[in-house]
Curated annotation (Swiss-Prot):
<dbReference type="Pfam" id="PF13483">
    <property type="entry name" value="Lactamase_B_3"/>
</dbReference>
<keyword id="KW-0813">Transport</keyword>
<dbReference type="GO" id="GO:0046381">
    <property type="term" value="P:CMP-N-acetylneuraminate metabolic process"/>
</dbReference>
<dbReference type="GO" id="GO:0046872">
    <property type="term" value="F:metal ion binding"/>
</dbReference>
<protein>
    <recommendedName>
        <fullName>Cytidine monophosphate-N-acetylneuraminic acid hydroxylase</fullName>
        <ecNumber>1.14.18.2</ecNumber>
    </recommendedName>
</protein>
<keyword id="KW-0560">Oxidoreductase</keyword>
<keyword id="KW-0001">2Fe-2S</keyword>
<keyword id="KW-0408">Iron</keyword>
<dbReference type="GO" id="GO:0005737">
    <property type="term" value="C:cytoplasm"/>
</dbReference>
<keyword id="KW-0411">Iron-sulfur</keyword>
<comment type="pathway">
    <text>Amino-sugar metabolism; N-acetylneuraminate metabolism.</text>
</comment>
<dbReference type="InterPro" id="IPR036866">
    <property type="entry name" value="RibonucZ/Hydroxyglut_hydro"/>
</dbReference>
<keyword id="KW-0479">Metal-binding</keyword>
<dbReference type="GO" id="GO:0006054">
    <property type="term" value="P:N-acetylneuraminate metabolic process"/>
</dbReference>
<keyword id="KW-0249">Electron transport</keyword>
<dbReference type="GO" id="GO:0030338">
    <property type="term" value="F:CMP-N-acetylneuraminate monooxygenase activity"/>
</dbReference>
<dbReference type="GO" id="GO:0051537">
    <property type="term" value="F:2 iron, 2 sulfur cluster binding"/>
</dbReference>
Length: 435
């Protein structure tokens, strides 16, 4: 599924990025594929699990909760990123007891035949990582979500290269409106961006000359009915289109992974034409999901709406003071909404001036960039209450945005998506003071 793969390396089993149940990014992303029915058993038997970064389509707490109930001491390996991958472990309530943080660029020896090395991303070193796994001298390179894996220094002629291909992992431009953001502009932008990504990936594969290329991760869908607009607008790249582009330009063999299918790398390296090298899913295997268990996950989000902290409007000052972003000329209007992004009757609607972290009743008279963020009330309150990162809102398509002028405020978004404090606001003492 998505970024999760089960590797059998001699007598060792290794699993990448297990997201096998529940949503990612609050309620915005759901699994495209139906995981094999024995996924939990197989995950519990893993000798090691690699989790590339903290985004919830790679670090899936619903999945890890199930795993921890069976085997809390399963060995998990993560890179030593500036923001710890498991920064939110205590809050999550998931009991995992064998998380190993390893330095970048150093081989980790598993046994005499197997070793792996975690590498950082050149563009998002504070968060993203990728991995090289080597078994008996044969290398598997999984670049995961890295924009510039290992700063562009990558091994040539690996046995297998895996790299993301789909695009669409951002709220931009689907969740934007006003100004140039017409439906025609969005459609054209998305089409152009996806094509650029395909060509970039095909060129990377051509340059690195792996024996086999596998398009992965990128298998998610915006399946909640309330997100129909996003699903229809946010067109993803088709893995087969990328594979065809690669075949046109090089001798590289390609393989699109599906649940229940197997790539026998040992056989394929001996003879790329071996018909037993790629085993298709057994007859009758369900490949794509056609139903998702929305209820329990939406209930968790909904539980935040009526929380006591939101009875006191002073939560706003408390929260943004905790967040710690200021001295930046930007005024943001935050509006709580219903499912359809219409202002919620009785919901909060307020201004934050980040120049001096004040909360004015109207926009200041000085010149200032302005952004309006409408957020579904269940998600914004869940995020506020638990001190979560705003990826849930932005990458999860849970906001609608307008901005004037039309510029991306990198410092603002980077702070709320990566740099928030590691512990949530102290709502307990807030309530004692407010009570």
């Amino acid at each position: 599924t998505h970024a999760c793969m089960d590797l059998k390396l001699g007598d060792k089993r290794m699993v990448f990025d297990p997201w096998l149940i529940g949503p990612a990014f609050a309620r915005g992303w759901w699994l495209l594929h139906e995981p094999p029915s024995d996924w939990l058993e197989r995950l519990s038997r893993a000798d090691l699990i690699y989790i590339s970064h903290m985004h919830s389509d790679h670090l899936s707490y619903p999945t890890l909760k199930k795993l921890a109930e069976r085997r809390p001491d399963v060995p998990i390996y993560v890179g030593n990123t500036e923001r710890p991958v498991f920064w939110n472990l205590n809050q999550s309530g998931v009991q995992l007891t064998n998380i190993n943080v390893v330095p970048f660029g150093i081989w980790q020896q598993v046994d005499k035949n197997l070793r792996f090395m975690i590498l950082m991303d050149g563009v998002h070193p504070e968060m993203d990582t990728c991995i090289i796994v080597e078994y008996k001298g044969h290398k598997i390179l999984n670049t995961v979500d890295c924009t510039r894996p290992n700063g562009g220094r990558l091994p040539m002629k690996v046995a297998l290269m895996m790299s993301d291909f789909a695009g669409g992992a951002s709220g931009f431009p689907m969740t934007f409106s006003g100004g140039k953001f017409t439906e025609e502009w969005k459609a054209q932008f998305i089409k152009t961006e996806r094509k650029k990504l395909l060509n970039y990936k095909a060129r990377l594969v051509k340059d690195l000359q792996p024996r086999i290329y596998c398009p992965f991760p990128g298998y998610f869908v915006e399946s909640h009915p309330a997100d129909k607009y996003i699903k229809e607008t946010n067109i993803k790249n088709d893995p087969n289109e990328l594979n065809n582009l690669i075949k046109k330009n090089s001798e590289v063999v390609t393989w699109t992974p599906r649940p229940g299918a197997t790539l026998d790398l040992g056989r394929m390296l001996k003879d790329p034409t071996d018909s037993k090298g790629i085993v298709e899913p057994p007859e009758g295997t369900k490949i794509y999901k056609d139903s998702w268990d929305f209820g329990p996950y939406l209930n968790i989000l909904n539980a935040a709406i009526g929380d006591e902290i939101f009875r006191h409007s002073s939560w706003i000052k408390e929260y943004f003071t905790w967040a710690g972003f200021k001295d930046y000329n930007l005024v943001v209007r935050m509006i709580e909404t219903d499912e359809d992004f219409s202002p919620l009757p009785g919901g909060y609607d307020y201004l934050v001036d980040f120049l001096d972290l004040s909360f004015p009743k109207e926009r200041p008279s000085r010149e200032h960039p302005y952004e309006e963020i409408r957020s579904r009330v269940d998600v914004i309150r869940h995020v506020v209450k638990n001190g979560l990162l705003w990826d849930d809102l932005y990458i999860g398509f849970q906001t609608r945005l307008q901005r004037d002028p039309d510029i991306y405020h990198h410092l603002f978004w980077n702070h709320f998506q990566i740099k928030l404090p590691l512990t949530p606001p102290d709502w307990k003492s807030f309530l004692m003071c407010s009570g």
